[in-house]
Each structure stands twice: as structure tokens, then as C-alpha cells.
Amino acid sequence: HPNVPEKCDPTNLPILGQGIAIKTACSQSYAGDAEAVAILTALCQAAHVPYQYFVNRSDMRGGSTLGSLLSAQLPIRTIDIGIPILAMHSARELMGTADQQALQQLTAAFFTEA
């Protein structure tokens, strides 16, 4: 977020309009492993879906999802993905419509290939 640049790594941030974000964290606050990332990346490439990577800062607690909990409790491969959002959880969030379209395209490709 531009108002708190000290919370962000300027070399590693999701960009609005550049596709879905594949999220990982060394703290395991996001679900996924190298194999899941490779499978998703291959699916994105085959379906011509734009994607980017987001890695939480390792020196600061970041967001988390239920993905890690689910992957630990269920015998299914799990990976956290999302649409880049500016000012998440604020009164006015901002996203790129192209990213939503990319997510819809990826979802259709996933269920077609599955």
C-alpha cells in the first residue's frame, strides 16, 4: 500500500492487471509447495492465463489464509492464489478487472483439465 511503504518489499509485489497472484511464505502462512506451484504454473501457461508470484516478507508477519490449515488436515493438494487488491480491508479496495477475468479463465481451465 502506498501509505505504508515500510510494510512492503518493493522488489516483490503483486501488480494490478498483471494476472492472478500465486502466494507463498516461508512461514507457511500460505498453502502450497513447489510441486503445487509447478502444476498451477503449467496450467496457467497452457490456458494462457497471466500470473505472478507473491512471497510474504520473511522478517515480518503477513497475512494468512485457511489454506495452510486445510492442507494439513485434508489429503488434497492445496495452493493459495488470489487477485491483487490495493488497500485490502479498507473502506475502498481497488482491483483490476483483467485479474478477475484471469481467475475465471484459470478456474474454467482447472475444471476442464481435472
Please place each PLM-identified region on the residue numbering.
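His/Asp/Glu-rich mid-to-C-terminal helical/loop segments that flank catalytic regions of hydrolases
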Residues: I83-A114
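Active-site-adjacent substrate-binding region
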Residues: N3-R92
